[in-house]
Amino acid sequence: ALANVQLNLQSAFRNCFEKSRKRQNGFPKFKSAKHSRKAYTTNNQKGTVAIIGNAIKLPKIGKVKAVIHRRPDADWIIKSATVSQDGDGKYYVSVLFEFARNITPVPISDNAVGLDYASDGLYVDDKGNTGTNHKYYRESHKKLAKEQRRLSRMKGSKKGETKSGNYIKQLRKVNKIHRHISNQRLDNLHKISAEIANQYDVVCVESLDMKAMSNKGFGNGKATMDNGYGLFLNML
């Protein structure tokens, strides 16, 4: 785990001083323990990381009960595991495997489609078809606002105040709603992007600055961010 931290630091400095990059990154910033991302990566060394039944084995921790999302095949080799804690207090382990697989070439055709951004749905293609996309943030907005008001009245909401136990519990409730909205959006975008990728060989899209479009000056920042079009393009 410590070796991976050192490698991440080395990579951050290399990206900072590398002049050949089109967009140069800034100098690495110190992250305090209070505001750091609660995650670490550990390497598998002689079986220190393993999936055993309904548990996962981690260095210095041992076996921990887990919900296994996907069972690995017998010939898969575990390389590393990343343990992270979400804002709602849940822990996740992402395991990196190495395995050999024969890739069958896919026949190339001229099946192509053009997509354009649509604020009401998700996209409009060159045939006039629109993508189905729910406004997940707006659907949960009232519930989220109610829990956020409760959070703002608790001890610890003001700067410099010590966060009380009730504040931390309420903060997890707010983060749980945010996670629910995010999971809904991700699931929908994964399904739509996979359907398009399987149906077409070439997908043409317009290069848009989504950050600029979500600016308050346009008056549709919330709708743009709730749309998730930029994430949809990354998935494609």
Task: Please give the residue ranges for each predicted region.
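Positively charged, helix-rich recognition surfaces that bind polyanionic ligands
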Residues: 74, 87-236
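Acidic carboxylate diad motif detector
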Residues: 1-87, 222, 226
